[in-house]
Structures are given as C-alpha cells and as structure tokens.
Regions:
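Tandem repeat scaffolds
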Residues: 1-119, 124-126
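Charge-dense polyanion-binding interfaces
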Residues: 129
Length: 129
C-alpha cells in the first residue's frame, strides 16, 4: 500500500477500482464530485455541507442522522420500517401514500388518530344537520 499526501492544491482525481479504506479528507471541497458503486460502510462525516446531495439506490441501514437540517428534503420510495425519529421539528412535514402500520407519534398509533379524526369529522357534520 502506498501512502500519499496532497496539501493546499486544487486538483481533479479520477480514481477507479481502488481501495481507499482508511483515507482521511480534512477541509476538502468535493463540490460536484460523483461517487458510483462506492462502499462507505463505517464512514463518518462531521461538519459536512451536503446541500443538493442526491442519493439513489443506497443502503443506509443503521445510519444515524444527528443534529442534521433536512428542511426541504424529499424522500421517495423509502423503506423506513423500524426507523426512529426523536427530538425533531416536523412542522409542515407532509406524508403521502405511505404505509403506516404500527407507526406511532408520542406512543399513539397514527392509524388510530386518523380513525378518530374521521369519526369526529362525521360527528361534526351530523351535528350541523
């Protein structure tokens, strides 16, 4: 294994079929970089600006988001079975066409909340008649 160091330079790299395990990038700009067929299991990112990042066909099992701003983010065709969201600001969050079996908010089953909402709505309609 050869070790190299690059300091204070602007360069473009085309790295293919390589093992860069254990590499360390500090104060580096990877703007517009492209990663294809990359294994980053166990990698960590601290103080990262990932605005505009697109992740497609990825396995994020066991991933942790901590102190992350996901405002204006879009999640499509996502499997979040067994995931947890804690201490989060979900103001204005929209969930559409989602399977919610067993989903809870503060310990209350969401399907029960929706059922109760529908029942109250019907009751309110009958009261006005």
């Amino acid at each position: 294994m050869t070790e190299s160091a690059i300091h204070d330079r602007k360069i473009s790299l085309d790295v293919r079929h390589s093992d860069l395990s254990g590499s360390r990038l500090v104060d580096v700009s990877l703007a517009a970089a492209s990663f294809e067929n990359v294994t980053m299991a166990g990698a960590s990112m601290l103080d990262a600006n990932l605005s505009g990042l697109s992740i497609v066909n990825a396995n994020l099992t066991g991933m942790t988001f901590d102190d992350v701003n996901l405002s204006s983010a879009t999640f499509e065709n996502v499997n979040m079975a067994g995931a947890s969201v804690r201490d989060a600001n979900l103001s204005g969050l929209s969930i559409e066409d989602a399977r919610i079996d067993g989903m809870t908010i503060n310990g209350i089953t969401v399907s029960d909340m929706i059922e109760l909402w529908h029942a109250n709505r019907k009751g309110a309609g009958n009261a006005q008649a």
